[in-house]
């Protein structure tokens, strides 16, 4: 009888555990969702068109988000917003990185020597989303310097499609001007609204920039023109790269 009683107690306990687990079932839609988008009032609208309401946060990251216009965020998508649209969700915001936004300098814009300077800049990634051409960039800065480097995307004359030059004014803080051990690497995210320039539903794009030549793992102080080209589609969407997490430094303007 003692064995029977023990078995019955075990079964009851197991059923209670199952019941508790069922009641505490995790309804989170997606963990560790990374996306880029714009802050709209108290909400975040991703480049995919999803509307996110922050109902939980880590620390004071939501307050930091509200101080920006565009950001890259890390969040858990908890559930669909009650009474909301099909693309409306409640999220737990874990982290955010500010994204600098600037207008493209068009053919009609009067240019200055300052804005067209072509100091080396390493364009790590380019992608199109939400009507923006987005970049993740890196460049050397002199250790301890607070000089903001100037970044621009400048439209160029071309006979076919669209050609843009990604420019960087380092204000003298280049690798050839100082020994390598006097530099840190800075950078981050920057977005340019592409729909303000490209009006077609589909068009060929090319972006060029200047960076240092590399020989294996050795970076030279010689420079070269690098570039990438592809097809722009007005309603297209490209997911942002998942590898970069470095914050956009205050040394970019």
Predicted regions and their residues:
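Bacterial signal peptide processing site
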Residues: 24-27
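C-terminal motif of bacterial Sec signal peptides marking the signal peptidase cleavage site
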Residues: 18-22
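Bacterial N-terminal signal peptides that target proteins for export
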Residues: 1-10
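First exposed extracellular module after export/assembly in secreted or surface-exposed proteins
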Residues: 32-253
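Conserved "right-hand" nucleotidyltransferase catalytic core of DNA-directed polymerases
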Residues: 11-15
């Amino acid at each position: 009888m003692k064995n029977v009683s023990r078995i019955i107690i075990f079964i009851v306990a197991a059923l209670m555990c199952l019941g508790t687990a069922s009641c505490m079932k995790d309804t989170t839609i997606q963990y560790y969702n990374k996306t880029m988008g714009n802050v709209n009032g108290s909400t975040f609208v991703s480049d995919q068109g999803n509307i996110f309401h922050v109902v939980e946060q880590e620390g004071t990251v939501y307050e930091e988000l509200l101080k920006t216009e565009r950001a890259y965020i890390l969040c858990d998508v908890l559930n669909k917003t009650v009474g909301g649209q099909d693309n409306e969700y409640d999220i737990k915001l874990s982290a955010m990185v500010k994204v600098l936004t600037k207008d493209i300098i068009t053919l009609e814009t009067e240019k200055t020597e300052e804005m067209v300077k072509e100091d080396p800049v390493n364009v790590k990634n380019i992608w199109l989303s939400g009507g923006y051409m987005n970049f993740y960039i890196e460049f050397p800065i002199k250790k301890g310097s607070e000089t903001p480097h100037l970044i621009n995307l400048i439209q160029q004359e071309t006979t076919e499609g669209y050609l843009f030059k990604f420019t960087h004014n380092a204000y003298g803080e280049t690798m050839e001007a100082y020994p390598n051990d006097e530099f840190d690497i800075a950078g981050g995210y920057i977005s340019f609204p592409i729909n303000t320039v490209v009006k077609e539903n589909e068009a060929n794009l090319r972006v060029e920039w200047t960076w240092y030549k590399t020989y294996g793992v050795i970076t030279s102080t010689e420079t070269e023109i690098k570039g990438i080209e592809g097809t722009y589609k007005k309603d297209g969407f490209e997911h942002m790269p998942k590898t970069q997490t470095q914050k956009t430094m205050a040394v970019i303007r």
